[in-house]
Amino acid sequence: MCGRRLLFLAAFGCLLANAFSLPATRNEEFDDGFPESEFDYEERHTREIPAQAYAPPIVYNSQSSYSPAKDQGYSAPAAPVYSPAAPSYSAPAAPSYSAPAAPSYSAPAAPSYSAPAAPSYSAPAAPSYSAPASSSYSAPAAPSYSAPAAPSYSAPAAPSYSAPASSSYSAPAAPSYSAPAAPSYSAPAAPSYSAPAAPSYSAPAAPSYSAPAAPSYSAPSAPSYSAQKTSSYSAPAAPSYHAPAAPASSYSAPAGPSYSAPAAPSYSAPSYSAPASSYSALKAPSYSAPAAPSYSAPAAPSYSSSASPSYSSPASSSYSAPAAPTYSAPKAQSYSAPAAPSYSAPAAPSYSAPASSSYSAPAAPSYSAPAAPSYSAPAAPSYSAPASSSYSAPAAPSYSAPAAPSYSAPASSSYSAPAAPSYSAPAAPSYSAPAAPSYSAPAAPSYSAPASSGYSAARAYSAGSAAPASGYSAPKTSSGYSAPASSGSPAASSYSAPASSTASSGYSAPASKSSGYARSEMDHQILGMARTAGGYGSAAPSAAYGAASLPSPPCPKNYVFSCSSVFTPAPCSQGYGY
């Protein structure tokens, strides 16, 4: 054993001496048995033969430990046997990390992340919120809540929401909710809005607005709500739905008289019902345009008054603030940024899950729960008081908090975190390259369009947001999603850097690493392999490689001398000293 080790050390020393005393032949360290002309660097270079094919051992044995073996016939294996190791470990580096990134995360991105986005999040939106809105909230809207629709939501509805408002929600609006407004919604609160609450807005609240919140309201977000986001729901949210916040007492007492009148002039929201069906189609044109003019103005006068305490406070803090900070900012940071980074990609997983957890949860617990218990019960016993305490408080804490913390945090923590860590890492390898092949393809057909146009528009959307300056633009730029982008250094490193950093080091490196091995490493006495190796199994690539931030464990000192090192690539970091 001792003799063998001594021989090995002697060979090692000889190799080192040769390596440093014969720099001209440094590229022939592992080709003792071959003529120099066949393996000299220049010829290799001209023939475009990757350096890995000749100097792979260096990857693990910094050219010395494995070299001596080469001398004794272990050398031959070194070149051929360990050489494959190089190609193996080298090629894998390129194809493995490269291809996996593209195909692995790409394919999943496309079918898994893409399809979900479209069918899962999209479909629900249409059927869930559409149908419910139509049958559940629509029907009630017509007879019960119709009047408001006519005068109030009619005008706003004019372009997009108009038709629904007109025919569906308009006609009913006049007779039904018009007169009822005072008597109806007052007393109706119990009978009129109560009953509707149960069948119309109540049931809808739970099934329609509740479920929709997650599935339905989610999908609309992408196609319909996305477009609207900028013009319609964004601006409205702040000015329109916020203004409602003002009429605190209005919605409280108004429940009877106030909500009655408002009902007429603006249950913009009412249209929100009919739109359900519309909300699908309308989503883009209808809810979009209406959102701005219709839902916006209505929000102020109609739902505004009422909104104040009940829906207003909500509007302000809850649905209003949300609108501006939450639903507006969300749009910017949450719904907006999402639109771009978040909602685009998230749409499927992120916004999908968020939709459930973030927007869904809020929607469900916040807007849903409130809708059912708060908006439902209040409707019956009192839309007035509930409006104030019930829908107001819920709105404020429930939809407000969700909006800010929930929808914001989601954007930041929930939506951001996903974006950063979850979507970030993917963003790098997955979303970066995949973005092109994987998420791009999906993006194109499934969510890419949104990602591309949507996501690009998201950028434009940001501009669009700019239109809704503070509500939409600021939030966007603000910390909501910018922070994620920023704090979402993930966004920067995760989402932006991923593309950049990943594309650069994580993704680009692999690609470049290949040729880097061939040229750079050979040129730099092959010892530079450690650098690339470091890049390969170290932090950045590590994170990018496995979408995990845990770096590979360092190889044991004797790894290079084990059999597995010859036949299989090292499952550990090949740093300096190996």
From Swiss-Prot:
Residues 133-442, 487-514 are annotated as: Disordered. Disruption phenotype: No effect on offspring viability; function may be redundant with that of other eggshell components. Dramatic increase in embryo dorsalization; when combined with mutation of pip. Becomes part of a disulfide-linked network including other vitelline membrane proteins, including Vm26Aa and Vm26Ab, during vitelline membrane biogenesis and maturation. Residues 549-578 form the VM domain. Secreted into the perivitelline space and becomes stably incorporated into the vitelline membrane (at protein level). Expressed throughout the follicle cell layer of stage 10 egg chambers. GO terms for molecular function: structural constituent of vitelline membrane. It comes from the Eukaryota. GO terms for cellular component: egg coat; extracellular region; vitelline envelope. GO terms for biological process: dorsal/ventral axis specification; vitelline membrane formation involved in chorion-containing eggshell formation. The keyword Cell inner membrane does not apply. It is found in: Secreted; Secreted, Extracellular space, Extracellular matrix. Keywords: Disulfide bond, Extracellular matrix, Secreted, Signal. Residues 1-21 form the signal peptide. Major early eggshell protein secreted by folicle cells into the perivitelline space and incorporated into the vitelline membrane. Localized sulfation by pip may be involved in embryo dorsal-ventral axis determination. PANTHER family: GOLGI-ASSOCIATED OLFACTORY SIGNALING REGULATOR (PTHR47641:SF1), PERIAXIN-LIKE (PTHR47641). This is Vitelline membrane-like protein. The gene is Vml.
